[in-house]
């Protein structure tokens, strides 16, 4: 039986713990830098130590992409990371998934998809052929990505968004819930609506 350490004691950890149980795996430790007084099902939370982390594969279960990246960079010299796929998900044998990435229930990942490290591919999302998803991306529940889409680092695709073939979503961009994206989204932009319109451009996107 595979045993894991989860790093982060927030809402995302609850979902990942459930997947671990569904996959007949073992949660060895739940660790957090600032453990809450009480947590889901009274799970005991430990302070992370180098000795503990070296002994097990780790999944960083922090929803915010920049925070997740910061923790991963800190841990990368210490420990190995686990990739987790819920047993109800379909992941093509011709696709690639990076380390630390989590694939939730009822997800479909089709042929020649490349998913980077430490991504969240959330419940019932569909990723069609030849998409490229870079590191630390969050694909929210029920998102549909048509073929040949590129999602750059740390981008977040909101619940139920739809993106047409061949589009590129820039680094740190946010696609709002329910948006329909029919053209490229620049880095740092926030896009909402049908068709998607830019409502904000971060400092990264303005540079």
Each predicted region: which residue ranges?
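Phosphate-bearing ligand-interacting subdomains
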Residues: 35-91
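Short active-site oxyanion
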Residues: 2-5, 27-28, 55-59, 81, ...
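Structural signal for interior beta-strand "rungs" in well-ordered beta-sheet cores
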Residues: 84-199
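Short alpha-helical
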Residues: 11, 66-67, 96, 180
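Hydrophobic, well-ordered beta-alpha structural blocks that scaffold small-molecule cofactor pockets
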Residues: 1-49
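Short amphipathic alpha-helical segments
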Residues: 17-19, 70-74, 115, 187, ...
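Short, basic/aromatic-enriched C-terminal tail that caps enzymatic domains
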Residues: 39-43, 191-207
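Small/polar loops that bind or transfer phosphate-bearing groups
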Residues: 8, 59-63, 165
């Amino acid at each position: 039986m595979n045993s894991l350490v989860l790093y982060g004691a927030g809402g995302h950890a609850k979902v990942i713990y459930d997947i671990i149980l569904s996959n007949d795996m073992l949660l060895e430790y739940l660790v957090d830098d600032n453990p809450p007084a009480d947590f889901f099902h009274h799970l005991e939370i430990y302070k992370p130590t180098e000795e503990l982390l070296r002994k097990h594969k780790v999944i960083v279960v922090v929803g915010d992409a920049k925070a997740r990246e910061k923790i991963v960079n800190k841990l990368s010299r210490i420990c190995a990371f686990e990739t987790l796929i819920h047993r109800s998900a379909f992941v093509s044998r011709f696709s690639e998934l990076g380390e630390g990435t989590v694939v939730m229930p009822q997800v479909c990942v089709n042929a020649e998809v490349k998913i980077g490290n430490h991504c969240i591919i959330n419940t019932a999302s569909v990723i069609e052929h030849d998409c490229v998803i870079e590191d630390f991306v969050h694909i929210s529940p029920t998102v549909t990505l048509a073929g040949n889409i590129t999602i750059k680092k740390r981008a977040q695709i909101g619940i139920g968004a739809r993106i047409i073939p061949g589009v590129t979503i820039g680094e740190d961009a946010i696609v709002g819930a329910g948006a329909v994206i029919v053209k490229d989204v620049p880095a740092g932009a926030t896009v909402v609506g049908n068709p998607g319109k830019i409502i904000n451009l971060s400092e990264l996107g303005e540079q």
